Amino acid sequence: MRIEKCYFCSGPIYPGHGMMFVRNDCKVFRFCKSKCHKNFKKKRNPRKVRWTKAFRKAAGKELTVDNSFEFEKRRNEPVKYQRELWNKTIDAMKRVEEIKQKRQAKFIMNRLKKNKELQKVQDIKEVKQNIHLIRAPLAGKGKQLEEKMVQQLQEDVDMEEAS
């Protein structure tokens, strides 16, 4: 089963799905959905359309340079079937996918770290600017305690006068 790539969004196209457009010069364009086909007909650049993989890679939002991508390249060299080789290949594919997932997660976390640091700096700046809006948690407690003590003293004095 051959899984093709969409020309516009680089998404996977499974057999029996999508649409194929063949130009007069025999160049084949495959599209996964009508949305991609319409955008292609409107001559939109996939690197400028924000939801495409091309945009995400160009903007640095996804991992682009990594050795694990070398395994996905198409090889048109026929190989004689051997059960051992087949099993080793499947194990290697699982391992490569595992490594790729880890690297992508690490890349995303590193990308988000910068934003977290900027957010911290902005929060500190905002607190410094609006410090007058923040009340100290024990600011009103002193007055309340003082009022309670005055009230108790008053009650004690009243009790002594009554007796």
Swiss-Prot record:
Q: What does UniProt give as GO cellular component?
A: nucleolus; nucleoplasm
The entry's localization annotation reads: Nucleus, Nucleolus
Q: Does the keyword Nucleus apply?
A: yes
Identify the keywords attached in UniProt to this record, alphabetized. Nucleus, Ribosome biogenesis
Report the GO molecular function annotations.
structural constituent of ribosome
In terms of superkingdom, the source organism counts as Eukaryota
Tell me, in one coarse class, where this protein mainly resides.
nucleus
Instruction: Answer yes or no on keyword Nucleus.
Output: yes
GO-annotated biological processes: ribosome biogenesis
Checking Pfam families in the record gives: Ribosomal_L24e
State the function annotated in the UniProt record: Involved in the biogenesis of the 60S ribosomal subunit. Ensures the docking of GTPBP4/NOG1 to pre-60S particles.
The record's similarity note reads: Belongs to the eukaryotic ribosomal protein eL24 family.
How it assembles, according to the record, is: Associated with nucleolar and cytoplasmic pre-60S particles. At the end of biogenesis it dissociates from cytoplasmic pre-60S particles and is likely to be exchanged for its ribosomal homolog, RPL24.
The identity of this protein, by name, is Probable ribosome biogenesis protein RLP24
Lineage per the UniProt record: Eukaryota, Metazoa, Chordata, Craniata, Vertebrata
